[in-house]
Amino acid sequence: MEDSAQDAVTAAPSGTPKSKLETLPREDLIKFAKKQMMLLQKAKARCTELDKEVEELKSKPVDGGTDDMIKVLTERLDALLLEKAETEQQCLCLKKENIKMKQEVEDSVTKLEETQKEFEQSHRNYVREMESVKNELIAVHSEHSKEKAALQRDLEGAVHRQAELLEQLKSQSDSEDNVKKLQEEIQNITAAFEEQTSCLQKQLEATSDEKQQEIIHLQKVIEDNAQHYQKDINTFQEEIVQLRATHKEEVNELMSQMETLAKEHEAAVNKLKENRVTLCETSETIPENYQCESESLNEDTSDASQENQKCSVALQEDPFAEHTVYDKVRQLEDSLKELESQHSILKDEVTYMNNLKLKLEMDAQHIKDEFFHEREDLEFKINELLLAKEEQSYVVEKLKYEREDLNRQLCCTVEQHNKEIQRLQEHHQKEISELSETFMSGSEKEKLALMFEIQGLKEQCENLQHEKQEVVLNYESLREMMEILQTELGESAGKISQEFETMKQQQASDVHELQQKLRTAFNEKDALLETINRLQGENEKLLSQELVSELESTMKNLKADNSMYLASLGQKDTLLQELEAKISSLAEEKDDFISKIKTSREEIDDLHQKWEREQKLSVELREAAEQAAQHNSELRQRVSELTGKLDEILREKSQNDQNIMVQMKTMTEDQEALSSKIKSLYEENNRLHSEKVQLSRDLEALQSQQDFAYKEHVAEFEKKLQLMVEERDDLNKLLENEQLQKSFVKTQLYEFLKQMRPSILEDNEEEDVVTVLKAVGESLVTVKEEKHNLVFEYDARVLELERRIKCLQEESVVQCEELRALVRDSEQEKILLRKELDEVTSTKEALQCDILEMKNTNEKTSLENQTLSTRVEELSRSLHSKNEVHNEKDLVIEHENLRLSLEQRESELQDVRAELMLLKDSLEKSPSVKNDQLSLVKELEEKIESLEKESKDKDEKISKIKLVAVRAKKELDSNRKEAQTLRDELESVQSEKDRLSASMKEFIQGAESYKNLLLEYDKQSEQLDVEKERANNFEHHIEDLTKQLRDSTCQYEKLTSDNEDLLARIETLQANARLLEAQILEVQRAKGVVEKELEAEKLQKEQKIKEHVSTTNELEELQLQFQKEKKQLQKTMQELELVKKDAQQTTLMNMEIADYERLMKELNQKLTNKNSKIEDLEQEMKIQKQKQETLQEEMTSLQSSVQHYEEKNAQIKQLLVKTKKELADAKQAETDHLLLQASLKGELEASQQQVEVYKIQLAEMTSEKHKIHEHLKTSAEQHQRTLSAYQQRVVALQEESRTAKAEQAAVTSEFENYKVRVHNVLKQQKNKSVSQAETEGAKQEREHLEMLIDQLKIKLQDSQNSLQISVSEFQTLQSEHDTLLERHNRMLQETVTKEAELREKLCSAQSENTMLKSEHAQTMCQLTSQNEALRNSFRDQVRHLQDEHRKTVETLQHQLSKVETQLFQLKSEPPTKSPASSHQPSKSLRERRTTDLPLLDMHTVTREEGEGMETTDSESVSSAGTHIQSLEQLLSSPDSKLERLTEASLWHTEFTKEELAEKLSSTTKSADHLNGLLRETEATNAILMEQIKLLKSEIRRLERNQEREKSVANLEYLKNVLLRFIFLKPGSERERLLPVIDTMLQLSPEEKGKLATVAQGEEESASRSSGWASYLHSWSGLR
């Protein structure tokens, strides 16, 4: 029994794997060792206490009333065990219900999340629709303004042309008559022109009114839609609020339930731990106690035997001594029984608690495994996300490079366009000057013709303007399409990201399920995969870092090269500096965005497709632009022609200048008033911008205050948490001290009892023990009450802290509401400011209309407008610069604020994550501290919720700021457009002034200023594009951050749900433990009552014990038998333990050992059940004792009834026989258990074989993995080789660029030297006279410099080409890198799919194996049945064959007889006959042939070798030609009469079975005999067949001889025919003889053909001579 107890104790730790203790850190091992030492000390103390109790029990005088006490206690213990089982079942039910409730809650949460996602999507769609409508309105407004500007420019061009024509007409006004006529004509033309202009203005006004009405209508529609959407949103928000309220209530209820369950679970866990400790202690002390008891019993038995020997002598002398001996024996027997019952109870408790311990350890292992696998899954997902982010960064870099290339191409095209415009203007001016010179010599008659032509050309100009407007509209529509495509790209990217997240979640769930299925078998594989992923991630990071560094270095080098090349051009220095600044800023932004922008893989494909579409659109746009440029060139040519013709007419308008001057004065006054208004509007604009800046600063201050307040709250919470942890530690220390005091008090009590024993009498001993026990119970109750009080105090403190936290949360919510109110106020102020801006824009539009009206008068004011134009230019520049500065400052401030807020958020999130990781580590390391850290987790949850709220508020603020920025940009655009219109007006005024002064130099200066303005406009547009790109990048970055926040929240929600599950389990265990404590208290109370009752019953039983003396001897015999059986059981237990040790040595896996130990524990439980049966037998023995008591009473009353007593003894002996039989049954059961163990061993071996199979599969999988790794290594090496090659190319290109730089430096130095020389030459030329001509040296230097400039241009082009080549090579490198990454990902996916397929194949193979087994069994059954059927059918066929054999034999006999007669007749005939005598049998043969065979055609039958005119020895007739029947054919045609007779004879009579059997035997014998005869006949048949062949050959020879004799008879006729054939000339007569020859000779078709050719005369005479002479000798038969 000692070994069994020790094995039961050691079984629990052996089930757990040893690797986990080895993997623990040093601190945890030290803690674990300390805990084990504490447990050992407690066990030792408990052992000492139990030893003391045993000694006390031994020293006590045992009364007879203990039996009833033991019965009651056993019954109570049984009831307690039943209650424990019931409580366990209730716990299981509660767990199942809890799981169901959790599932329902998760389902409801998923539904709510889905509804929230749907609502968010609908809200996003509404917002996008609103933005699209706004964009459309803005586009319409911009189109309207562009149309206005175009019309204004056309009007200005017409005015300029009129002014130029007037100037030209002044110079040619020679005669007054011509001038008068021209003035009249010009007045008519001007009236018509003014009418046309008025009509155009009216049309413009009408179109503007219509557009305004449309805009108003669209605004109304937008407002209606906005109201409708707001109503829908409000309804949805109300529904969401209701759902949230219901969800919160449900969650609160569930949380309350979970808390209660968690508390109960914690209590139960603590109780179970205590019980486990106590049971371990008791299990260790039980074997020692049992040894002590067994030794004491042996001593007692020895003493008792000696005393019995003594007493037997004394009893013979004294009857009183005999009575005392019997009393002592009874006392010893009672003590024995009590000890045995206690031993069995302790055994049951030990086994039960061991089972509980194993269950709890398995649960803990399961929880740890689940946590470990979840952690691995999260790490795997993180690696996947990092890979996706890196891939997306590469794609973004590609798109940026492509965009930069497109921008460069656009800049080049714009520059080329500007150059072409300049060339056309110069050409136009030259043509105007030439036409003006030629026009002076023209005649007056051409003027009238030109007038008509001018009218036609005006109409053509109008048509061309309409066409130009259509082209502009098409271009704007294309731009709108591009913008729509960009918006659609953004939307599709969002949708794709959502779909990718859902796909990720689905994949994560699928992967989680697969991992749960395959964790036991593929742990090593998971470790390998983790290492592979880590190495791949590091490799990719290193590659990306190397690529980024190389790219940065190459980019910097290229930028430096570009700056050096562009520095050589002096005119573009300023542009290069600005571009370098922009490029540096873009590079910094690029580095930032590369680290931040990381999206999914599927977006890459969509972006590539859309990029291709955009390229196609850009190509189409370029083609359209080229067409427009061609159209513009054609228009310019026409305009040049028209201007030449209009020059003559416009000279007559010189007189109208005086009137125009008067009107110009009025215009100047109006313009001054307008300038004052513009100044006031700009001041209002500045004021509004300053207010915006103040509002943004206030918002930043509020945000900073809020963050500071949150940080203070967090610090306070952390301090409170530290205080709580310290208090918890103090309470734990107090509890430990109290437990030590309890143990000390118990030891003192036991010592006190030992001291008091000798002085107290036997009667008073029991009362003192009861009093001490009561005092101990009362002390225990007080201690428990103190424990409960402490727990309640701790709970109250926790509640107070929770209340404080809630108050702080409410305060934070109030602060958030206040901040939101401030934000709303600021938004309202912004709305008011926007309204004011709208009013200002309306006033601006009105002013623009006024300006349009005043433009007609502006044409006359030329001299006084110079001062005004300068003032207006200065004002416009200053205002434009101020606006740009303010807008840039605002944008910079907003971006900095956004960056600061995002950095703060990221830092907070990192802090929270760090705290969560610390909590996880602490939970993993110390599971006993989980209950204490619940408050920490709750507070962290609250912090995270508050941070999430802050992030949401900040996101809303950021979105609002974005909207404000977009509006500000739009306002900037409108302001810039207005400034451009003002500049265009100023330029027109300057051009008018220049033309009035008639100086071409001033006109050229105006054109140059116009070019500068266009360049500035291009710069501003580029700046706008850059700012738009920055805004888009920031938006993408914010979207990525929001996605990361969502992912982190999802992970946090999962962790919180896991923590809640753990809390619920702990609470249920606590509740169970509390219930058990209450039950124990009730049992203790009942125990006290029972002890009192036992004391009363003891007095009654002392009298009855004296009567049991007679039955003690029989009981002793039974006890001896019982001990023997116990020894046998111990032997069996030892054997089982040996078997267990052998199994432990042989087994390979710890889990299988644990299963085997569980089975062994079940067997132990069965043994304990057997022990309980034995106890039942003992109870039956007690019942027999009661019967014996009744017999003793009868003995006192009736001593004479001894015979009746003997009968009762016989009955008792029968009962003993029954018990022996039951013991034999128990032995048989033990043998059955041994057989079960053997079967289990067989199953273990089978499972080991399966494990080996699985190992083989694992080895195969690992080999495949190694192959894949090698393939990956080879691909990586190839990639590195390509990278090295490309790096070498880059180095070569860098060297070329350096050489180019050196050459450029040399050229620049030469150019500077040339400048110095030119400067010196110019100084010398100034000193010389003006009349001297230029020297030839200067011309040579100029030519040399022009050559150098051409060479430099060529070098620049070469460098640009090399740059383009390097860029293309870089793109190819990137594409190859992307393809390699895709291959790598495909390989990973293929490995995963292959694993899944192999597993599916395994499952399918197993299922197919089972199916094949079942099919094999079915086919075996079917084959057996078929075999039986075939046997029967073959028997029937054999019978039929035997019958047919008989028939054939009879027919053959008849045929043989016939054949023999025929042969005899043939032999009797003579072999050689004369021709006359042989003619008769030939006739008979022929007649026979005619009857048997069909008629033969002589034409169709071919000759054989011996036929014709050859000898008679050779055979000429073929077997097919003769058709002689063979012997087999003759035999197969029997007589019908004989067949009928045989059939009639066979089927005539029916016989009995016996007769049939006799006939069968006789027929078999006859069949054998007939078989022999058949063989003999077959041999004779063969001989006969040979003879028949000889006879046939002879018959054929004779027939041929007869035929030849016939032919010899016909020789004379044939001779005559042949002679005629020979001697006739070739022609028709010969051809007539051919059929006769054919019938006579029976020619073959080939011979016929030859004769036909001879008859026609184609053969020669030589062929004739070799005709039939050779046949004559053979026919005679002499050869």
Swiss-Prot record:
Gene Ontology biological process terms from the UniProt entry: Golgi ribbon formation; late endosome to Golgi transport; microtubule anchoring; microtubule organizing center organization; protein localization to Golgi apparatus; protein targeting to lysosome; recycling endosome to Golgi transport; regulation of protein exit from endoplasmic reticulum
Molecular function terms, GO-annotated: identical protein binding
Membrane topology qualifier: Peripheral membrane protein
Chain segments annotated as coiled-coil in the UniProt record: 35-1469
Location in the cell: Cytoplasm; Golgi apparatus, trans-Golgi network membrane
Domain (GRIP) ranges: 1604-1654
GO cellular component, one term: trans-Golgi network
Region (Mediates interaction with RAB6A): 1569-1608
SMART domains, per database record: Grip
Residue ranges, compositional bias (Polar residues): 1474-1483
Residue ranges, annotated region (Mediates interaction with RAB9A): 1569-1679
Gene3D superfamilies assigned to the protein according to its UniProt record, in alphabetical order: GRIP domain
Entry keyword set: Acetylation, Coiled coil, Cytoplasm, Golgi apparatus, Membrane, Phosphoprotein, Protein transport, Transport
InterPro entries registered for this protein in UniProt: GCC2_Rab_bind, GRIP_dom, MT-Golgi_org_protein
Residues that bear N-acetylmethionine: 1
Chain positions covered by the region annotation Disordered: 1-23, 1466-1522
Modified residues (Phosphoserine): 1474, 1478
Origin: domain of life: Eukaryota
Free-text function comment from the UniProt entry: Golgin which probably tethers transport vesicles to the trans-Golgi network (TGN) and regulates vesicular transport between the endosomes and the Golgi. As a RAB9A effector it is involved in recycling of the mannose 6-phosphate receptor from the late endosomes to the TGN. May also play a role in transport between the recycling endosomes and the Golgi. Required for maintenance of the Golgi structure, it is involved in the biogenesis of noncentrosomal, Golgi-associated microtubules through recruitment of CLASP1 and CLASP2.
Subunit-level organization: Homodimer. Interacts (via GRIP domain) with RAB6A (preferentially in its GTP-bound form). May interact (RAB6A-dependent) with ARL1; might be involved in GCC2 Golgi localization. Interacts with CLASP1 and CLASP2; recruits both proteins to membranes of the TGN. Interacts with STX16. Interacts (probably via GRIP domain) with RAB9A (preferentially in its GTP-bound form).
Record note on domains: Extended rod-like protein with coiled-coil domains.
Protein name, per record: GRIP and coiled-coil domain-containing protein 2
Source species of the chain: Rattus norvegicus (Rat)
Native organism taxonomy: Eukaryota, Metazoa, Chordata, Craniata, Vertebrata
Gene that specifies this protein: Gcc2
